[in-house]
A protein has these predicted regions:
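Beta-strand-rich ligand- or partner-binding modules
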Residues: 1-152
Length: 152
C-alpha cells in the first residue's frame, strides 16, 4: 500500500481594472469593491479630533503585487455612520508615499508609509488595505500595521 498526502492552497488575488473587469466595483465605494483580498479595520474612535493620518505597514510585496490603502473619517457633528461614508485613497490612488524596492522573498519585509494631512477635523476613522497582484503564488504579506491620527 502506498500513501499520498496533498496540501493545496489557493490565494484569491488579482488586479481588477475599471472597464475591463466584469461587474467592476471601485474600492472607494462605501461597501464592497472588486478586489477579493482586503482587510478592513474596526472603526477607531478618538478622544480629541484629528486632521491628519500617518500609517506604516511592514510588508513583503513582490514586483508582481501591490498594497493600496484607503481611509474614511467622520466627525462628531456628522449625522452619517462611518460605514455610510465612501472610502478615500491615500495619495489619490491608494499607493504609498514612496515605494521601496520589491521584496525578494516572503521574509523580506519593508516599511510602507501612507500619510494624509489637511483633512477636515474627524473623531473616528477606519482603514482598508487592498492587496492586488497578478501571480496568486506571491501575494503581498503584511506583518504589522501602525498608525497615528494627528491634530496638526
Amino acid at each position: 500500500t502506498q500513501r499520498l498526502s496533498l496540501f493545496l492552497i489557493q490565494n484569491r488575488l488579482f488586479s481588477p481594472v475599471s472597464g475591463t473587469t466584469p461587474d467592476f466595483v471601485a474600492e472607494t465605494t462605501n461597501t464592497g469593491g472588486s478586489s477579493p483580498a482586503k482587510y478592513i479595520t474596526r472603526p477607531i474612535t478618538l478622544e480629541n479630533e484629528a486632521t491628519a493620518l500617518d500609517i506604516r505597514l511592514s510588508a513583503a510585496v513582490r514586483s508582481t503585487s501591490a498594497v493600496k490603502m484607503f481611509y474614511r473619517t467622520t466627525s462628531v457633528d456628522d449625522v452619517r455612520k462611518l460605514g455610510d461614508v465612501a472610502w478615500r485613497a491615500f495619495n489619490t490612488d491608494g499607493s504609498a508615499d514612496s515605494s521601496p524596492e520589491p521584496s525578494k522573498n516572503d521574509n523580506d519585509f519593508k516599511e510602507f508609509k501612507f500619510s494624509q494631512s489637511d483633512l477636515e477635523p474627524f473623531s473616528a476613522f477606519s482603514l482598508k488595505i487592498v492587496l492586488t497582484g497578478t501571480i496568486s503564488s506571491y501575494p503581498p504579506l503584511i506583518k504589522d500595521m501602525r498608525g497615528i491620527a494627528l491634530a496638526v
